[in-house]
């Protein structure tokens, strides 16, 4: 190819791409010459590979037109070469991908796609049909947001999503996706508005947290968008298996929820099955089908009612009866379970083998909790409540997550005092605190220490360093940057988030066979199953929900733990620094619930687990099956879509 031919081809290259490459190359070079020694900024041959990788696209007609398709292809190539850069490493053999390179590579693409997103939305906001669909979908998901405890609409969940299914059935795919996205934004904003409270106490800039909140809400909305996209795609199929795929959609939706509980971005906060938590009779079937089974029932009920509207006669009446049948079936089964003598609230609590547990709720304000000047007063208040307000005969005293607001190894006098308190009270004391381990003395290493969010068990008569449990599930972006182990360059990022390392062990403490869970840990069913299989008979959940302020979040957190107690027949002693603390038996009965920001000590004899549930035995298999179902369902939809296109072309 001659130079003239090359220049002729360049004339047809989209102007946006030329600008993109020029800006990328310029910024890369400027950054290199300004700060060539910055950790993570190794703009040498590997760093330039993404630019070099673009050259073949200059000679490929398919990459030039249409431009969006080119951007997709080029994005894949860029990511591939970023991974290659990471593998090649630097002169010291330490693999990484430069942070600046990542930013300068993806920000132009993000700007382009954001502009496309804005244009797409403007188009739909001008269309009457899209606005009608948006109104219906927002009505549906908006009401669902008010169904999660402590809000009251839970029992209506079997019909609340009917307007959304009408949108999916009656409107084209693009309109359905548009309506679902913005309806889900409303839904998730109502559900997670309390994250705004973190801005009042977090160290990161409030504007950055606000941006993070918007991105989180958009990210969570994409799961509903995926469901809408797939449903609308299947709806348009013209083959015999279409009805089967539509009938399996409720399972597909539950599998999306299951997927959301895995990985570094795991956030299993508000599954649809959690909406019935206000009604003890309605949640007893959790012990058989789990929360994802409830999601399947809810989605199936709404889908069937939406399908019933265009039907006639007896068929229509029969389909409209489905939500009532499901509701009363759950109610009858729940009443049957709770009518058994052993299902009485805190049955057999007085048994000698059961421990007496005291929980100390000091309600330390989050803004004051990490103040060095207030450390002594915070610890003194907590310890005084533990010593003065607990009754004789207490076996376990619980202090909240980070009740010691420091790295406990830096506080030898606090450790000594906790040993003395355990001896004086003749009780085990579990307290939350931070801990650390030095892993490097290299001053240039961004992670010279591993930091842990942990709990420590002090037992009477044992003055060795206390037994430690390290929190296993860390809150994304709050306690840890996702994928920082895969991309060590992320360890250089400091946006005010924690930099904790997750734990790996699931302890079972004797003599009462109980297991500690810290905050977020307690909403993951797999951790509960692991502990039960190790012989645990009681969950002890310590948390600090003071971040959430006076909002629905502490009640949502408590509701999830309660539903897990019913699912696995697993009693819970739950202590929150600022509420809501409560005792929960293996059937979900509450006792001594505290109020938010109430200073109080609650204490009782706590019955241990005596119940084996069906879901405990099959839950792991069922949840893994959901993940496989998600993959198979998506592949099936993709294959049929491709076959449909090929048939149309032929």
Q: What spans do the regions from the language model cover?
A:
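Second-shell loop/turn segments in exported
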Residues: 216, 372, 405
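Solvent-exposed soluble domains appended to multi-pass membrane proteins
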Residues: 380, 391, 395-650
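Membrane-interface segments at or immediately adjacent to transmembrane helices
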Residues: 278-284, 326-399, 409-419
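Generic hydrophobic alpha-helical segments
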Residues: 164, 226, 230, 382-386, ...
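Residue-level signal for alpha-helix termini/capping positions
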Residues: 169, 235, 310-313, 387-391, ...
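Membrane-embedded alpha-helical bundles of multi-pass enzymes
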Residues: 12, 19-341, 550, 564, ...
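Short, Lys/Arg-rich, polar N-terminal cytosolic tail immediately upstream
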Residues: 1-10
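Short, conserved active-site loops that position catalytic residues or coordinate cofactors/metal ions
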Residues: 148-163, 187-194, 361-362, 393-407, ...
């Amino acid at each position: 190819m001659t130079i003239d031919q090359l220049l002729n081809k360049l004339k047809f290259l989209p102007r946006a791409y030329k600008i993109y490459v020029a800006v990328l190359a310029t910024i890369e070079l400027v950054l290199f010459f300004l700060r060539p020694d910055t950790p993570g900024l190794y703009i040498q041959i590997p760093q330039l590979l993404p630019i070099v990788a673009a050259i073949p696209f200059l000679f490929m007609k398919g990459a030039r037109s249409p431009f969006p398709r080119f951007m997709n292809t080029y994005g894949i190539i860029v990511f591939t070469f970023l991974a290659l850069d990471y593998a090649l490493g630097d002169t010291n053999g330490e693999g990484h991908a430069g942070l600046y390179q990542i930013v300068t590579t993806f920000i132009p693409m993000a700007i382009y796609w954001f502009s496309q997103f804005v244009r797409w939305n403007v188009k739909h906001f001008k269309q009457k049909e899209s606005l009608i669909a948006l109104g219906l979908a927002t009505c549906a998901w908006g009401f669902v947001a008010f169904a999660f405890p402590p809000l009251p609409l839970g029992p209506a969940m079997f019909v609340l999503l009917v307007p959304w299914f009408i949108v999916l059935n009656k409107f084209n795919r693009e309109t359905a996706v548009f309506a679902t996205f913005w309806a889900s934004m409303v839904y998730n904003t109502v559900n997670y508005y309390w994250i705004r409270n973190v801005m009042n106490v977090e160290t990161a800039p409030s504007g950055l947290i606000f941006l993070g909140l918007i991105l989180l809400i958009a990210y969570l909305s994409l799961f509903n968008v995926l469901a809408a996209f797939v449903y609308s795609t299947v709806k348009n199929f013209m083959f015999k298996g279409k009805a089967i795929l539509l009938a399996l959609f409720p399972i597909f939706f539950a599998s999306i929820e299951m997927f959301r509980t895995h990985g570094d971005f795991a956030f299993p906060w508000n599954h649809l099955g959690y909406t019935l938590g206000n009604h003890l009779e309605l949640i007893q079937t959790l012990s058989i089908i789990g929360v994802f089974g409830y999601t399947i029932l809810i989605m199936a009920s709404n889908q069937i009612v939406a399908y019933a509207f265009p039907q006639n006669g007896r068929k229509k009446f029969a389909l409209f009866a489905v939500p009532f049948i499901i509701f009363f079936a759950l109610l009858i089964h729940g009443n049957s379970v709770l009518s058994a003598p052993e299902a009485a609230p805190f049955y057999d609590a007085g048994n000698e083998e059961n421990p007496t547990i005291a929980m100390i709720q000091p309600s330390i304000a989050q803004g004051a909790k990490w103040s060095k000047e207030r450390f002594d007063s915070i610890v003194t208040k907590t310890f005084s409540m533990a010593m003065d307000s607990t009754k004789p005969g207490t076996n376990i005293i619980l202090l909240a997550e980070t009740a010691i607001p420091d790295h406990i190894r830096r506080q030898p006098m606090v450790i000594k005092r906790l040993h003395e308190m355990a001896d004086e009270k003749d009780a085990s004391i579990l307290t939350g605190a931070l801990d650390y381990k030095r892993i490097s003395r290299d001053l240039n290493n961004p992670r010279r220490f591993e930091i842990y969010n942990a709990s420590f068990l002090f037992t009477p008569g044992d003055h060795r360093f206390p037994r430690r449990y390290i929190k296993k599930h860390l809150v994304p972006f709050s306690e840890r940057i996702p994928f920082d182990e895969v991309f060590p360059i992320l360890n250089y990022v400091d946006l005010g988030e924690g930099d904790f390392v997750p734990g790996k062990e699931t302890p079972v403490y004797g003599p009462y066979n109980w297991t500690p869970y810290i905050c977020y840990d307690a909403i993951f069913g797999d951790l509960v199953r692991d502990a039960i299989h190790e012989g645990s008979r009681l969950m002890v959940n310590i948390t600090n929900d003071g971040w959430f302020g006076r909002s629905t979040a502490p009640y949502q957190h408590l509701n999830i733990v309660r539903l897990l107690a019913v699912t696995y027949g697993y009693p819970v002693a739950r202590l929150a620094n600022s509420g809501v603390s409560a005792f929960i038996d293996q059937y979900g009965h509450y006792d001594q619930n505290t109020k938010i920001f109430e200073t109080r000590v609650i204490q009782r004899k706590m019955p241990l687990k005596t119940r084996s549930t069906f879901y405990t035995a099959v839950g792991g298999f069922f949840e893994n099956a959901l993940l496989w179902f998600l993959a198979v369902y998506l592949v099936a939809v993709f294959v049929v879509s491709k076959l449909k296109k090929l048939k149309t072309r032929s």
